[in-house]
Structure formats: C-alpha cells, structure tokens
C-alpha cells in the first residue's frame, strides 16, 4: 500500500504473490518472504528464488541472518539454512540449484511447523543465537553451533550385518574410510 491505496503490480513475478509475511535486509538487498518463495528487491526490480532453485518449500514466513553468511528461513516444514551468496547467485541466474539445508523434528525440534501466529517468528539475539517460534514452543540455535559451520551428518560405521549371513551365507564385509 502506497498512500493508503492498493498498488497494482507491474512486474509479472508479483502478480502470483498472494501473501507477504516478512522482510529483511541482507547482503545489501531487501529480501521479502512470500507464499511464492523469496523475492529480492534491487534497483526497483524483483527477482524470485523458490523451490525451482532448491528451496525445500515455497511458503516462507520469516528469515533471519546469522552473521556467518547464511539466511535462515522458516516455514510449515521446518527451518532452512542457505548461504546468502548462493541466494544472490540464484536470484541473478548464475546458480541453478541451492545447497539449502532443512532442519526439523529429526534434528531435535519439538515441531517443524514454524509459521508463528505473530511476528517476528525468527530473531537473532545479541549473543548471536537464533530463536524460532514453532507450533510447540521455541527452537534455539546457539552461537557455538552456528560458528562451527559444519552441519554434515556424522560418519556412519556399520559394525555388524547379521542379516547378510542368513541370506547370503558366510560373507564378511570390510568397510573402510
């Protein structure tokens, strides 16, 4: 609304957007959370980053920058961490697929539903921790976790496979790194 009257979108990308949930400035640009993914506003123009580029979901309710080069997004299916430089590259058309990481109940959250009933649903505290409103409380990522920057799953070691002997006879497996 400009001057208390609706604004008719001039760009086709805006015509599909029904809901705007939040905005933040990150990397020197305005990012807008919508029901159609993220919109980046630069010099009066909008570009879209959505599931077509690798976001796990399109309806994004809020976002918060972590101070370590990532933007964290909230939605009905969890929290997503994505590198800000990747978002910029995807919005510019220089990157076809984001390396977005989704966190949810399997990662220890009581609920992956992070739409919140009021704003803000995501917040960065002065100590660097990130707080997210969920349907069953608050999920918090501490600054130590964020600074590690390694969110990969731990290595898996298979020590025994009792089924193999029953099905295939006496087969021994040797797994090495």
Positions of PLM-derived features:
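Surface-exposed loop/turn elements that mediate protein-protein interactions on large endomembrane-trafficking
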Residues: 1-2
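Short acidic alpha-helical/loop segments enriched in Asp/Glu that coordinate divalent cations
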Residues: 9
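Residue-level "micro-hotspots" composed of small/polar
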Residues: 12-21, 36, 47-177
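Repeat-blade elements of multi-bladed beta-propeller folds
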Residues: 25-27
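Surface-exposed extracellular loop regions of Gram-negative outer-membrane beta-barrel proteins
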Residues: 41-42
């Amino acid at each position: 609304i400009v001057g208390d009257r609706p604004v008719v979108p001039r760009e086709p990308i805006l015509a599909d957007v029904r809901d705007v949930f939040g905005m933040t400035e990150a990397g020197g640009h305005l990012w807008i959370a919508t029901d159609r993914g993220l919109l980046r506003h630069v010099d009066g123009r909008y570009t879209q980053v959505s599931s077509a580029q690798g976001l796990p979901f399109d309806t994004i309710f809020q976002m918060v920058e972590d101070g370590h080069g990532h933007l964290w997004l909230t939605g009905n299916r969890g929290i997503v961490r994505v590198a800000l430089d990747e978002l910029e590259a995807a919005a510019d058309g220089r990157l076809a697929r984001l390396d977005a990481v989704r966190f949810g109940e399997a990662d220890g959250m009581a609920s992956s539903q992070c739409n919140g009933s009021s704003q803000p649903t995501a917040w960065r505290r002065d100590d660097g921790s990130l707080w997210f409103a969920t349907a069953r409380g608050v999920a918090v990522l501490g600054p130590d976790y964020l600074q590690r920057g390694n969110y990969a799953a731990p290595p898996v070691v298979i020590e025994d496979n009792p089924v193999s002997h029953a099905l295939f006879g006496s087969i021994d497996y040797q797994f090495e790194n």
